[in-house]
Amino acid sequence: MADKRPSSDGRPKDFQAATHWLAGLMDLELGSGPKNPAKKDGGVDVVATNMILFDRRFQNFQIKAERGNTQWLIGIDGDDVRGSALWQPDGAGFISARFSQLHLPAANPPPPGKARAVTSNTGRLPSMDIAADSFQIGKRKFGRLELLSKQEGQDWRIERVRLSSPAGVFSADGVWQGWLDRPQTSLNVNLRVSDLGQFLGNVGYPGAVKRGNAEINGQVSWIGDPYALDPPTLSGNFTLAAKSGQFLKAEPGVGKLLGLISLQSLPKRISLDFRDIFSEGFAFDDIAATVKMDLGEMKTD
């Protein structure tokens, strides 16, 4: 854990703020690094064989932080994450980070009855400007990540999040309300996919669809954090349009297409090309649907 002693040994006044923020952000199991990661020059050098962050376990992780005049310069290197960040501690704080690789392990939710982890022991969540050339969650590959956000009172305003790859682009904006105590996430979303089969394969549904393009527009909300979608509380509405694709035999339902809608729930505005129905699956020319969600229940027009 980071050193929480008063800075009575000549360290800068904001040393405690930096180390407390790191300590509140991470639950560390120290590896070969020093037991006390605080450096005499006011920096922080943490080496961990395991680090738990947002209920995700990172392996072989190192953080080096050096203090500038008004900010901290942070280097991050690990099996899953490589990059650098700049942290300005004034006010709620501001983080600007650039990653060549940001691969988040699959989440391990806390056991029932265990309190939700608090991201910062200051009760404030920093504003963020984050970009990653390669962003991945578990085995799901999302391409390039861009995130802009800022704190507004008890909320965290998501000004822009964008995930882009050759197969498609997802963009959203919204708010993380009451993030510290009673979190709820609300987003305006847009997804444009130029190769539906490749896109679905990247995000964990290989072999569901061949070819195709699609677009989704709408608003969604759920109880919980942005990084922890809760299907039973999911509400909102969106429109779906898809063209020139084919459901493969192994995955005949649109449930695998979006993880939300089944083939049987689609409206009649679907034209089928049956040239490959007996060999590979259903080919479609055009699909259009308006979907409404209420606490996990879904209806289509």
Describe the predicted segments one by one.
Residues 58-59:
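Extended alpha-helical rod segments
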Residues 35, 40:
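Contiguous, function-dense segments enriched for cysteine-driven chemistry
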Residues 3-18, 41-54, 73-115, 120-141, ...:
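Small-residue helix/turn framework positions
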